[in-house]
Amino acid sequence: MEHRCGKKLFEKTEIVSHEYAGADCYCLTVRLPRMMEVPELPRAGQFYMISLHDKSHILPRPISLHSFDEKQGTLSFVYRPIGAGTQELTQYRAGESLAIQGPLGNGFMIPSAGSCHIIAGGGIGLAPLPQLIRAIRCKQPEARIIFFAGGRDRHIQELIDFFALPADIELVLCTDDGSLGINGFVPDVLSAYIEKCRNSGNLCADIAMIYACGPTAMLNKIRAFSQSAQLPCQLSLERRMACGVRACMGCSIQTAAGVKKVCADGPVFDSLLFPHELP
């Protein structure tokens, strides 16, 4: 499928803003001049390859889409600097140019059936989920959305505040150290919440989907729970990528349907493709 901002070539953008988003994360916003000219918008869960100025970093960095503004022609990326490449990225300023490629991969699919959407994110895996919430709201304005958001400590609140989430979603915060919200990990809190609500009849029975993005350990637990509870689930995987366009084998992963490439077949997959633990 050809996507709205082009899939094969890097395109020059201008950095509109670059700000601290909280919880050791930054938000980079760029303007893509031809965003209004082509036929398909990016989807929540897709990603872009970002080319760095320092060409000693030969490979571009894959970063998931945080949000986009069609009218302004802007794309935003929330990321956490971990390696040398993303550390360099923090130094870029408004007015500078930046080459990006995308949108790439397959994003989240929002089913038409079902009235309750359950979203789970942990750490930097929270970044693409606000756009997913907006997409669900656009497709199903009356849908119930329950958002389980987890982080190491209370500083995750900074990121949640930065997201400016819709007031009508149900937000369940949890932290590893118990300094904010529920003391626990997202998969445990999510599964306990659903089971409790199911038993009391307070959760709408018509669950459309569980959407999850975060560390592999978190995804494995949610995968196992969704399968045991017979609930539909999509997982957004994070893997190291060299090309982003299926040209190499760097992000290959074994699934029930054979070997898939996370960059092109994913990063979002149906959890049923993984009957066993994710590697």
List the model feature ranges, each with a label.
Residues E2-A94:
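Ferredoxin-reductase
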Residues S56-I63, G105-A113, C263:
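Short, Lys/Arg- and Gly-enriched loop/turn segments at beta-strand edges
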Residues R154-H155, S179-L180, R240-G244, F269:
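Short gly/pro/ser/thr-enriched loop/turn and capping motifs at secondary-structure boundaries
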Residues A84-L235:
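FNR/FR-type flavoprotein reductase catalytic core
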Residues T216-A217, E238-P267:
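Local cysteine-cluster metal-coordination motifs and their immediate loop/turn environment
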Residues H3, E158-L159, K260-P279:
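Short Fe-S-cluster ligation motifs
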